[in-house]
């Protein structure tokens, strides 16, 4: 049935053709007499309330496309298209009060451990609260703090206390403090690698994490890749430039140590850049990048590599520092639908040609791009974009529309 008709609503009793939209509408419950049982539970406060030393309430939760510790989902680059990297989310008022900016590295500390993450302002988080997805464990995050102690994934910060009845751990709340992480030297590595090499490289990079004040390694891309390649992202930060030998070790792991790599080194300033291109037909594609020290070029060179754009026009300008690209690069935009690799700009452009009510516009969008027609996880985002497009259409002149 799943192969023929797609996802089904649970529960689906044997012999039924469709799942039950709502349980217990007949008033019969799975007990001996068919009547519901209610448990009068006394209110219990959180095990670790906020205080002056730990003024933020950290909550954790799941991401749309990931599952628990990512032992399976964490191996698929396509599932990182929706949320590519770990962050800690704070209310914008708290970000301003702390004197921080989006993207700044911060240390989130509890009475049990510490984790370093980039900061992201979010209106969905209440003041005095912080949110970190529960999936970001030591498989992807690492580093060593200023006292030489290992950094942890998010569960190294959360609380091990369990509910006396269910024995479930209280992982959804912990008191934490958040402060800037003094790690000004940065490193970014990106590479397309054969699958087996990517697995070995990921483990080798994980072994290097303790040498930095912050490090992560994650896959990216879309399976199956036309050439059987897997994308790998490496990011690290430190209070001072890393030893050149360590930088060269990362270069070699990312396939940037051969004679086909373009390399720039400024040892005195701790600045290193390396790129590797591969000929494919009439084009030269970027297959590996390392930026160390000045990583501002990430804003455009990452798009070139991940979207596999022709890069031959850039030449040695690929080694240029700074956030301004030598040739304009248009990013594909945020991925919304993982199943069909549909991005937000694709959706916005298509909705500009749609007409009718919200349901009609959603149906036209799905017919044109197929987004939201498989697993359905992106439907809430799609409906939000439909509403936004309708609001925009109400205050602008009408555009060419698609038939209802």
PLM region spans:
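Local cysteine-cluster metal-coordination motifs and their immediate loop/turn environment
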Residues: 333-346, 367-384
